[in-house]
């Protein structure tokens, strides 16, 4: 529970995430339930006030969470402190986390120092979160050996299999004294997942670290999830083995599949390799930050914009600006000064714990929630759970609560435009590859053979005296900032586009008068969709 699950439930599934954890706990009352908590970010993409953090942790514990794995995307321990203390206060298991990555500044000494700070905060255990599978076996042995020497609390490891090293890394970490390790049942393991449970049990069989788990009892579990997995085949990424590019790009498995899906939805999957190559450059510009939510989305979205727009940083997302300003905390290394100047100008950079600048907010959020559901006539209970949904996801949360009993609401159909260029894709169906080309005349060829395909665009080409500004990437219109007929200065924000869970400002290219606005909040758009018209 936690992590991206909460967001996915309310954004895509129309499912109450609180009800999910309650059901799981009721089915497994004797098994401790664990969640992934992004420190001061909770399950959202910005920092929340300390009282909101306290309320969320308390509510999660009441609803069935026992173990709280707390991490910070920048590995800034100040951003984990309040969440860890909140877990301790409700008598949960507080597991502090280091989000493993590699860079010139990330050394064994740095990790050990961070781990000691986490222990000093009162954490009951420490997790090594290797979200991209970058931890090499012998480095893992050295790291765990040092941590066992320096710490008194148990050490847990979470290592993805994307690079193919997870099994060896797990074995070497266990040899060094690792206490616990995450695995996946075999039918849901490897590639974007983890080391197979059965594999590690077999490796340790007959050793002094034998698990005692009966392999035969795992067989029906593996068979069950083998059937379940087939239902979700269309959502899986294209990776079938090992992707060694991750050793350079450091893209975690979850980020890989998200990028693939986003680029497919924007008819730009052919630019995937360019985006992968851009990611480490953006990451370095932002101070060698680890790629884990929300920084993975921040870096990923900016990389997509840099590639699709054809000009690096011609558009800088609000989240990148916030990171450059220090609103997410201290970066591992200094950020690119030129980018910082371009992004935030002369604005002062925050050096304190970012949440110290936030006033207690829960009571005001509660009042706003009650007023909003009354104004919009939303039949949602003003429960702590619903208020917390609203606190973390104001727009998405309200839409969820308003439409929770309307399943069709959670299926969005993108807008189309008349001008369509040739697009080629390599599609794999049942391990058989097909070359599919969508041509500008709306015809389709599969392996060179013509097919019939009708396309009915729902947005007509804009006609007018002004310049038409098009969407630089696909996403949903989050907010319009101006009205038709309004005068704007150059570089004024006209629209806010939400893409890959990040907000991107669409600005006026010059001073002028806004003509027709072709979209409204909630609309889905693709790259090239007309957004608005501006006349000088």
Q: Which residues does each predicted region cover?
A:
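Terminal or standalone catalytic/regulatory effector modules within metabolic enzymes
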Residues: 1-9, 240-243, 254-452
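Active-site beta->alpha loop and helix N-cap motifs at the rims of alpha/beta catalytic domains
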Residues: 2-114, 119, 126, 133-137
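Glycine-rich phosphate-binding active-site loops on the catalytic face of alpha/beta enzymes
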Residues: 70, 130, 176-193
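Conserved, mostly hydrophobic/aromatic
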Residues: 70, 126, 177, 200, ...
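Catalytic cores of alpha/beta
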Residues: 109-114, 163-178
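Core active-site phosphate/anionic-ligand binding loop and the adjoining beta-turn-alpha structural block
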Residues: 168, 193, 197, 201, ...
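Structured functional modules or segments
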Residues: 459-536
């Amino acid at each position: 529970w936690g992590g991206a699950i909460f967001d996915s439930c309310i954004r895509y599934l129309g499912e109450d995430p609180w009800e999910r954890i309650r059901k799981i706990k009721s089915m497994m009352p004797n098994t401790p339930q664990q969640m992934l908590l992004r420190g001061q970010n909770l399950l959202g993409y910005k920092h929340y006030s300390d009282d909101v953090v306290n309320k969320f942790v308390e509510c999660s514990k009441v609803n069935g969470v026992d173990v709280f794995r707390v991490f910070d995307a920048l590995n800034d321990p100040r951003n984990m402190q309040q969440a860890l203390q909140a877990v301790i206060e409700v008598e949960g298991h507080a597991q502090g986390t280091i989000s493993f990555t590699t860079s010139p500044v990330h050394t064994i000494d740095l990790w050990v120092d961070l781990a000691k700070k986490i222990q000093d905060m009162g954490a009951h255990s420490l997790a090594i979160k290797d979200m991209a599978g970058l931890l090499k076996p012998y480095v893992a042995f050295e790291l765990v050996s040092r941590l066992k020497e320096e710490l008194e609390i148990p050490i847990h490891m979470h290592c993805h299999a994307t690079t193919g090293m997870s099994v060896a890394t797990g074995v070497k970490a266990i040899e060094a004294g690792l206490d616990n390790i995450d695995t996946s049942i075999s039918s849901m393991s490897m590639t974007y997942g983890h080391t197979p449970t059965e594999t590690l049990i077999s490796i340790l069989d007959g050793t002094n670290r034998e698990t005692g788990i009966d392999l035969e009892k795992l067989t029906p579990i593996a068979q069950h999830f083998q059937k379940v997995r087939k239902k979700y085949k269309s959502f899986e990424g294209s990776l079938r083995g090992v992707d060694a590019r991750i050793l350079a790009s450091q893209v975690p498995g979850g980020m890989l599949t998200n990028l693939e899906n986003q680029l497919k939805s924007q008819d730009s999957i052919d630019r995937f390799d360019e985006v992968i190559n851009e990611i480490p450059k953006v990451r370095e510009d932002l101070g060698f930050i680890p790629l884990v939510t929300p920084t993975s989305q921040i870096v990923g979205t900016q990389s997509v914009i840099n590639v699709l727009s054809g000009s690096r940083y011609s558009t800088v997302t609000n989240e990148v600006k916030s990171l450059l300003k220090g609103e997410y905390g201290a970066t591992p290394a200094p950020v690119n000064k030129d980018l910082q100047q371009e992004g935030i100008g002369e604005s002062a950079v925050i050096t304190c714990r970012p949440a110290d600048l936030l006033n207690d907010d829960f009571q005001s959020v509660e009042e706003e929630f009650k007023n909003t559901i009354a104004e919009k006539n939303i039949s949602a209970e003003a429960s702590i759970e619903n208020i917390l949904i609203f606190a973390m996801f104001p727009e998405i949360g309200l839409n969820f609560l308003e439409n929770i009993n309307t399943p069709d609401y959670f299926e969005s159909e993108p807008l189309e435009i008349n001008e369509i260029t040739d697009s080629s894709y390599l599609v794999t169906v049942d391990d058989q590859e097909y070359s599919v080309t969508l041509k500008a005349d709306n015809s389709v060829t599969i392996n060179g053979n013509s097919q019939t395909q009708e396309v009915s665009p729902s947005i007509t080409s804009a006609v007018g005296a002004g310049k038409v500004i098009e969407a630089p990437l696909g996403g949903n219109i989050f907010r319009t900032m101006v009205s038709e007929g309004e005068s704007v200065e150059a570089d004024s924000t006209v629209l806010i586009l939400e893409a890959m869970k990040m907000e991107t400002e669409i600005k006026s290219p010059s001073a002028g008068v806004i003509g027709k606005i072709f979209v409204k909040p909630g609309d889905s758009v693709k790259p090239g969709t007309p957004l608005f018209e501006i006349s000088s």
